[in-house]
């Protein structure tokens, strides 16, 4: 796992378009076979386990039927082990496709957005959210995936911490700093980077 990768370029998108179209216009320009999927408020607060991340890339390389590996456990009701730290993600999961930090086979992530409905990330009702609608698309494409879990503690309502990739999921909730779930981590980042919490409210 290359820990010295530098940003090659920023790929802009049209702010007037919906999330799915924005994402599709960008991912089509990614040349690498695998990509690390993150949202902009997924802030890394500790050193990732690069050795384990490389191991997970090797898992994808050695198993062509797999499309992704989530780097943290979510609301996953089934325990189907693949290895000591990886579990199969049951396709019946309501959030089978999720915006959780994940390693993806780039071409498969592109297909989900290519055939998915043109929606935003968030919506007033569940079926207006791309994350929800894309789960049906992923199932129809035969997408299969795993998730990392190594006994980490639950954080908030929907996520667990991750030893392999320690990050905030999410640092912002509806535009507010998520101090209720990541108070310690965000205070540390505030001190290191001079973040002014007063410029936006917090929850």
Each language-model region and where it sits:
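Active-site-proximal specificity loops/subdomain of glycosyltransferases
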Residues: 1-31
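Catalytic metal- and UDP-sugar-binding loop of GT-A-like glycosyltransferases, i.e.
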Residues: 38
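Short aromatic/hydrophobic "clamp" motif used to bind/position activated sugar donors
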Residues: 35
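Acidic metal-phosphate-binding loop of nucleotide-sugar-dependent transferases
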Residues: 42-44
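Terminal low-complexity segments of carbohydrate-biosynthetic enzymes
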Residues: 187-203
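Short, flexible, basic/aromatic active-site loop/helix in glycosyltransferases
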Residues: 80-94, 108
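Conserved donor-nucleotide/metal-binding helix-loop-beta segment in metal-dependent transferases, i.e.
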Residues: 46-75
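Catalytic core and acceptor-binding pocket of nucleotide-sugar-dependent glycosyltransferases
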Residues: 94-180
């Amino acid at each position: 796992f290359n820990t010295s990768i530098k940003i090659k370029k920023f790929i802009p998108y049209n702010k007037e378009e919906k999330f799915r179209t924005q994402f599709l216009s960008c991912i089509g320009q990614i040349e690498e076979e695998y990509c690390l999927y993150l949202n902009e408020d997924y802030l890394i607060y500790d050193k990732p386990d690069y050795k384990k991340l490389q191991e997970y890339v090797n898992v994808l390389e050695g198993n062509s039927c797999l499309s992704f590996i989530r780097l943290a456990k979510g609301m996953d009701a089934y325990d189907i082990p693949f290895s000591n730290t990886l579990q199969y993600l049951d396709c019946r999961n309501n959030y089978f496709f999720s915006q959780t930090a994940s390693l993806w086979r780039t071409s498969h992530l592109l297909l989900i957005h290519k055939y998915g409905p043109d929606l935003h990330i968030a919506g007033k009702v569940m079926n207006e959210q791309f994350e929800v609608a894309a789960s049906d698309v992923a199932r129809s494409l035969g997408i299969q995936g795993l998730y990392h879990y190594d006994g980490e503690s639950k954080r908030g309502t929907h996520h667990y911490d991750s030893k392999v990739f320690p990050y905030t999921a999410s640092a912002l909730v509806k535009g507010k700093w998520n101090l209720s779930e990541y108070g310690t981590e965000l205070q540390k980042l505030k001190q290191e980077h001079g973040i002014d919490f007063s410029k936006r409210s917090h929850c």
